[in-house]
From Swiss-Prot:
Disulphide linkage map: none
GO-annotated cellular components: cytoplasm; nucleoid
Summary of subunit composition and partner proteins: Forms oligomers.
CDD domains, alphabetized: MraZ_C, MraZ_N
Domain SpoVT-AbrB, residue spans: 5-51, 80-123
Pfam families to which the protein is assigned, alphabetical: MraZ
Organism superkingdom: Bacteria
Keyword field: Cytoplasm, DNA-binding, Repeat, Transcription, Transcription regulation
GO molecular function: DNA-binding transcription factor activity; transcription cis-regulatory region binding
Main location: cytoplasm
Protein name per Swiss-Prot or TrEMBL: Transcriptional regulator MraZ
Listed NCBIfam families: division/cell wall cluster transcriptional repressor MraZ (TIGR00242)
A biological-process GO annotation: negative regulation of DNA-templated transcription initiation
């Protein structure tokens, strides 16, 4: 499982150094290839390549006659790129994806089970503050019987 939050700095070339705790797991379980894509304007998704393939298949299976779904396919699949982790555990994030999501220097790498989300660190702090301010009664209604 991929979990935890790491605040990292991109180097001057736009490379992200995957933290050692994740690098070892990724290399042993999934190999050195990752797939990065855009899901929204505020963050990127970063999948180990084997975890991306079923997501890609589900996206390709969506009905293409629906204009909204077609736009979503175009957004996610059209921006998907395979990255190779170098010997130092770094991946080069495509410049266009960095621009679209305002990833410049400080970023938050957020483990989400089968993938990472990659946020501008300031935006991540804002998202975290918003999450902490969620109305607990409203959240309980949505969670039903689920507890931690």
């Amino acid at each position: 499982m991929i979990g935890g939050v790491s605040i990292l700095s991109l180097d001057s070339k736009g490379r992200l150094a995957i933290p050692a705790k994740h690098r070892e797991t990724l290399l042993s379980a999934f190999g050195h290839k990752l797939v990065v894509t855009l899901e929204s304007q505020d963050h990127l998704l970063l999948y180990p390549e084997p975890n991306w393939r079923p997501v890609e298949a589900r996206l390709l299976a969506l009905p293409t006659g629906n204009p909204t779904l077609k736009r979503y396919q175009r957004l996610v699949l059209g921006h998907a790129e395979t990255l190779e982790m170098d010997s130092a555990g770094r991946v080069l994030l495509p410049a266009r994806l960095r621009e679209l999501t305002a990833l410049d220097k400080d970023v938050a790498l957020v483990g989400m089970g089968n993938r990472f989300e990659l946020w501008n660190a300031e935006e991540w702090d804002s998202q975290t503050a918003d999450a902490l301010a969620i109305d607990q009664a409203d959240l309980a209604q949505h969670l039903g019987d689920f507890t931690l």
